[in-house]
Amino acid sequence: MYKNLSAGMGDPYWYEWLIGVYYALGMLPPDNDIDYVTLQAIEFQGLDDVVIGYKSGEISGIQVKHTRDSNSLTFYNLIYSTPSRISLLAELFTDWKKMYESGLYSHCNAILLTNRKGGIRNSTIGKASKNPVTLPALQTFWKDIKIQIANERCTNIDSISVEGQWQTAWNMFLNELVDSTDTTKLEFLKSFDIKTNQEDLDGYVENIKRKLFGYFKM
């Protein structure tokens, strides 16, 4: 039996497992497009928490981040790395790229799902240095990027523009999309989504109940 050694055993409240159950219930309607739902998929390391395969050949890999604290998910959380560990963004991109380049799927989605709120304030790193860097509020930044990418005129990375004060941060973001062409980077940005401020554990329990009640007319 294979084991994904980096796959978490679920947080104390089994948050990612409930999300998996929530999506698995979507297989009950006879006209659904979901082919399978896998928890902690052995073939992936970053997008392994919940993997959804669709009958159309599309696949969605979800990394779940649960917290009981009130801290938000920030731009810095995405790009932060250490000498021994790549950034969260690089991890998600690497797994997505593996899916994308395999040729096994008609389309590959990468999703970061969390009950944390999206950061709403700019921040600064390297304040003590000569070249401090302004990092954008993640919620504002990501919304703006997704709007630009959705425009049919956005055909390459250079089509995406950011505020001048964010340019260095944007370059840092793109640098985390390692060993890839600009075309692949753009495809990832189109396929990547950050879902912040999701339901907590109790909220997903209620969502599951509502789905079951609806399907079985309880």
Regions found by a protein language model. Give the residues of each.
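Acidic metal-coordinating catalytic centers involved in nucleic-acid phosphodiester chemistry
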Residues: M1-Y13, V64-M218
